[in-house]
UniProtKB/Swiss-Prot annotation:
Signal peptide (residue range): 1-18
Disease: Transcobalamin II deficiency: An autosomal recessive disorder manifesting in early infancy and characterized by failure to thrive, megaloblastic anemia, pancytopenia, and agammaglobulinemia. Additional features include methylmalonic aciduria, recurrent infections, vomiting and diarrhea. TCN2D may be accompanied by neurological complications, including psychomotor and mental developmental delay, if untreated.
UniProt-listed PROSITE patterns: COBALAMIN_BINDING
Domain of life of the organism encoding this protein: Eukaryota
SUPFAM superfamilies (alphabetical): Terpenoid cyclases/Protein prenyltransferases
GO biological process: cobalamin transport; cobalt ion transport
Keywords from the named record: Cobalt, Cobalt transport, Disease variant, Disulfide bond, Ion transport, Metal-binding, Secreted, Signal, Transport
GO cellular component: external side of plasma membrane; extracellular region; extracellular space; lysosomal lumen; plasma membrane
Gene this protein is translated from: TCN2
Protein name (database record): Transcobalamin-2
Organism: Homo sapiens
Molecular function GO terms recorded: cargo receptor ligand activity; cobalamin binding; metal ion binding; molecular carrier activity
InterPro entries hit by this protein: Cbl-bd_prot, Cobalamin_Transport, Terpenoid_cyclase/PrenylTrfase, Transcobalamin-like_C
Primary subcellular site in the record, as a coarse category: secreted
Length: 427
């Protein structure tokens, strides 16, 4: 009996040493306001604007949009299956000018799991095959010596593995090996926090599903490595990397308990930073909101292994319309210094305008041209003054003197007197 008591005491001590990443509840009105930002996006049902992440975020949140959710999922199924399957063996894309990427396909598979569905039947098999072909193609691009790079990114590579895992679809060890190699400390290049977090979520799903048993030890070590790297990336304010990579980082950390108090302390600090960012209105982008809402409901993408589709959720009501006040005119300087001849022009716009509004006004005034492409996180620049971003290049937004902007052209709202620079950079 004495030995049993000692054993139970030891178990209690070990349990006390294990810390979970827990985010205390936030003000429900603040969370509801966040969810209300997604409602207008759910009325945009064209293929270009459909975003599976919005559906996933709502289903894993404490909020619901009622019949809007059903219509949105129906539109996702119609659009994605028509474009991805209708042209799977044909060069003719028909009306699918904005054919979904493989990253979008992976998120679509997450959306199905968020509705407690598995891909099944002939159509489902073809979708799975397309995602597996994508991973194989990326694997070849990385190369057997790991000196190459994915055509897209390791973020999309990890997302693809996660999506297949959630649907109980196995991928070959050689596919997992590329992601393992990318995060292992003795091979590790520089990866952003959200890329590391997505890889960590993929590894966590593989481990919990008992997939790739021959890689189990490496997967366990990779989860530990990712956790350590994310914790190291915490800023003095409390964000992991930056404010917009913090939600996905928290999703991973919430699935990855560790001994000691470091994890719990870091997550509480992140919660304080997130609260301040929410109160400042930092979260306006639909993709970022959809990654944060599950965290505020103590959920992660890993919950899609066994989703709870009957959990009670509060009905969202549209935000009350505010009567616009008379807006002042502000002056924003737009400059492009990485091209010859350089461009620099003062642009007058309404206060509250986005960078995209500034670009449109500059184009209307003449002497400035640009092109954009839609993505799940919003439009991004593909060409400025006739100069297209090449492979492994992108047009970066900076606030003068030299501060990279974390938000995209449709989200950042410059203040009066600010200078916005568009700079072509390599990565």
């Amino acid at each position: 009996m004495r030995h049993l008591g000692a054993f139970l005491f030891l178990l209690g001590v070990l349990g006390a040493l294990t810390e979970m990443c827990e985010i205390p509840e936030m003000d429900s009105h603040l969370v509801e306001k966040l969810g209300q930002h997604l409602l207008p996006w759910m009325d945009r049902l064209s293929l270009e604007h459909l975003n599976p992440s919005i559906y996933v975020g709502l289903r894993l949140s404490s909020l619901q949009a009622g019949t809007k959710e059903d219509l949105y999922l129906h539109s996702l199924k119609l659009g994605y299956q028509q474009c991805l399957l209708g042209s799977a063996f044909s060069e003719d894309d028909g009306d699918c000018q904005g054919k979904p990427s493989m990253g979008q396909l992976a998120l679509y598979l997450l959306a199905l799991r968020a509705n407690c569905e598995f891909v099944r039947g002939h159509k489902g098999d073809r979708l799975v095959s397309q995602l597996k072909w994508f991973l194989e193609d990326e694997k070849r691009a990385i190369g057997h010596d790991h000196k190459g790079h994915p055509h897209t990114s390791y973020y999309q590579y990890g997302l693809g593995i996660l999506a297949l895992c959630l649907h109980q679809k196995r991928v070959h060890d050689s596919v997992v090996d590329k992601l393992l190699y990318a995060v292992e400390p003795f091979h590790q290049g520089h990866h952003s926090v959200d890329t590391a977090a997505m890889a960590g979520l993929a590894f966590t799903c593989l481990k919990r599903s008992n997939f790739n048993p021959g890689r189990r030890q490496r997967i366990t070590m990779a989860i530990r490595t990712v956790r350590e790297e994310i914790l190291k990336a915490q800023t003095p304010e409390g964000h992991f990397g930056n404010v917009y990579s913090t939600p996905l980082a928290l999703q991973f950390l919430m699935t990855s308990p560790m001994r000691g108090a470091e994890l719990g302390t870091a997550c509480l600090k992140a919660r304080v930073a997130l609260l301040a960012s929410l109160q400042d209105g930092a979260f306006q982008n639909a993709l970022m909101i959809s990654q944060l809402l599950p965290v505020l409901n103590h959920k992660t993408y890993i919950d899609l292994i066994f989703p709870d589709c009957l959990a009670p959720r509060v009905m969202l009501e549209p935000a009350a319309e505010t009567i616009p006040q008379t807006q002042e005119i502000i002056s924003v300087t737009l400059q492009v210094l990485s091209l010859l001849p350089p461009y620099r022009q003062s642009i007058s716009v309404l206060a509250g305008s986005t960078v995209e509004d500034v670009l449109k006004k500059a184009h209307e005034l003449g002497g400035f041209t640009y092109e954009t492409q839609a993505s799940l996180s919003g439009p991004y620049l593909t060409s400025v003054m006739g100069k297209a971003a090449g492979e492994r290049e992108f047009w970066q937004l900076l606030r003068d003197p030299n501060t990279p902007l974390l938000q995209g052209i449709a989200d950042y709202r410059p203040k009066d007197g600010e200078t916005i620079e568009l700079r072509l950079v390599s990565w």
